Amino acid sequence: MKTGFFLFAACAALVAVQAQEATNSTVKYIDYSSLKKFTRAPRTKAPPTKETTIQQSSLSGSQEQQQEQIETPAPTRVPAPTRPNPRATKAPTPAPTPAPTPAPTPAPTPAPTPAPTPDPGPWEAKWIDHDQVKPFAQPEPVTISEKAAVKYKPQIHIVNGCHPYPAVNEAGETSGGLKTKGAPSAGCKGSGWGSQVYGRSTWVRGVWAIMYSWYFPKDSPSSGLGHRHDWEHVIVWIDNPDIENPKILAVTPSAHSGYSKQVPPKADCVDGTSVKVKYESKWPVNHALDSTSEGGDFQDLIMWDQLSENARRAMNGVGWGKANTPFNDGNFLPKLDKAWPF
């Protein structure tokens, strides 16, 4: 009985498939639900018929309702983090910081005006023994004029009479000199402290003049003749102290309130850049300077501007009897004018 039913159902299905292929009609599906107990569904589904379509639709609807009831809700999708767009949001531009206002600079307090230096009044001479006056040491030359003065420093040869001595010390104390008794060189053959030559220089009518002065405690051709104190000097005239090799143009030694002049000096009266002079008295005439070929001695040179203030005041204020300071403020320029050799 079962076998016959199975054969009948199979034939009916085959007829239905052939009819579908012949008519090329709408695919119809066969409901295999009643045959599941006897056979298994074919691997390839046949096109459903109208009736099977309705049945499957009903079945599908029922299944969909069941699936909706048991369907697991889809997980909520976590949105990916949004990458910030650097162009979208711009950092706020900070407001410019105003430059600090500088504190007002106070006006400089003017330096107090120093009280005027009171006039010291006339110089009061401070005499000390002629052999107690300490000379100034020769400073290192710095200026052009100082260097030229050292370079052309003369040498003096003592024929007779006193040797040169310092005239003033740093404190302004001055030599008391010597009386005119005894031999011309008695008591004045040289200081134990050393000797000194004084210098001062300037331009005169386009020529550079350097005056060198010596002090002697007395000028005495013989005992009782002459006078206390003596000053003698020589002026060396050069073309320009500021060139490499200045030229000696003339030499004017002092002689009895006047000058002897050599323009230019004799070759044998110059030793390199040092002119040579002699100190001599031809009896009964007092001492004077003159050019010579004989070599002499050098002394430490101190220029006018290198003297202490008190020493300059003393040189300007002290009276030396019949002698006078040739390089002080009152005598320097007049003597240069008088000695002009050209």
UniProtKB/Swiss-Prot annotation:
Belongs to the Necrosis inducing protein (NPP1) family. Its main location: secreted. Keywords: Glycoprotein, Secreted, Signal, Virulence. One of its GO terms (cellular component) is extracellular region. Residues 1-19 form the signal peptide. The keyword Signal applies. It comes from Phytophthora capsici. It is found in: Secreted. Induction: Differentially expressed during the developmental and plant infection phases. Residues 93-121 have a biased composition (Pro residues). This is NLP effector protein Pc107869. The keyword Signal applies. Key residues/motif important for the effector activities are degenerated in most NLPs, including the nlp24 peptide consisting of the conserved region I (11-aa immunogenic part) and conserved region II (the heptapeptide GHRHDWE motif) that is important for phytotoxic activity. Residues 55-75 have a biased composition (Low complexity). Glycans are attached at residue 24. A motif (Hepta-peptide GHRHDWE motif) lies at residues 226-232. The lineage of its organism: Eukaryota, Sar, Stramenopiles, Oomycota, Peronosporales. Residues 41-125 are annotated as: Disordered. Secreted effector that contributes strongly to virulence during infection by P.capsici. Induces cell death in the Solanaceae, including Nicotiana benthamiana.
